[in-house]
Amino acid sequence: VCIYGGIMEYDKKNGFTKIKSEPDFHLVIANSNIKHSTESVVAGVKQFKEENETEFSKLCNDESELVEDVLKLLSVNNIKELGQKIIQNQEYLETIGVSNEKLRDMIQVGQKSSFGAKITGAGGGGCIFSLTDESNLEHSINQFRDKNYECFSVKIDFKGLDTF
């Protein structure tokens, strides 16, 4: 992504595909400062899958549909609906058990001040992100800082690597 810029989609079958869209949004990244083990989070998800095969299968199908919806929303720069899909994805992550109380609190702060917020990465700790635009960027940052959460904003670079 750093080389090509923009947004990439990945799936096991096709690998990486660049999304031909340049939506105009910011992400506010907030850090829980909770150290976590990806290995133990993955083991927990595996256990959830083994104990809840039907539910896990349904979640995987629902997630595939959600990805298709997100790709469409990105192509038309529909940030508000994209935020709703982010919230929906976070609900799936809650179901499989990769969240905790601090992450839930951070997500709640993010969802109140942005279009949507969710865990990024494996879960269990680390960071969350909130989807914002210019209208709610500073408010979202201030809400996280008011709760003493470290945060910063990022915007997607659509240009990628450039020679000098």
List where the protein language model places each region.
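C-terminal nucleotide
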Residues: 1-118, 129-164
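Conserved glycine-rich beta-strand-loop-beta hairpin in the small C-terminal domain of fold type I
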Residues: 126
